Amino acid sequence: MAANGSNVVSRGAVRFTEEQEALVLKSWAIMKNDSAHIGHRFFLKIFEVAPSARQLFSFLRNSDVPLEKNPKLKIHAMAVFVMTCEAAAQLRKTGRVTVRDTTIKRLGSTHFKNGVSDAHFEVAKFALLETIKEAVPASMWSPAMKGAWGEAYDHLVAAIKQGMKPAAA
């Protein structure tokens, strides 16, 4: 890990092929300008698949604001979606998940405190892949693109889980 708290997270080099990188970069280029809307759709899909996941978010627990209109959810969703996509886009070039050390530790700690489990990460992965599939042109989506985004997501989750360990919290 970098002593200056910058961009190093995962231990050891990540294997992410040129083809995977190209698929992620091509699709992210299409989604980037609409990341606020797409990120919000990503979270709405999470709550559609797992309504109880709302309880994991302090700003949603006692809120009467519909998810579609909740400004805090919109801000959070965009930040998470952009971070996920940017980390995926950098994976091959850097050989690791590139999210600030302090951010990944905070994410790990927050996810640990809120009781996020492997099942929650799987729901989020499903929702992410479905959201990306809906956001890119149908002719672009392929099993290879799904695999590239899935692998990138898995690397990000592995980095977050490192921060979820009690010793790291």
Swiss-Prot record:
Homodimer. PANTHER family: LEGHEMOGLOBIN-RELATED, NON-SYMBIOTIC HEMOGLOBIN 3. A motif (Homodimerization) lies at residues 48-52, 118-130. This is Anaerobic nitrite reductase NSHB3. GO terms for molecular function: heme binding; metal ion binding; oxidoreductase activity; oxygen binding; oxygen carrier activity. It comes from the Eukaryota. One of its GO terms (biological process) is response to abscisic acid. It is found in: Cytoplasm; Nucleus. Its EC number is 1.7.2.-. It is an enzyme of class 1 (oxidoreductase). PROSITE patterns: GLOBIN, PLANT_GLOBIN.
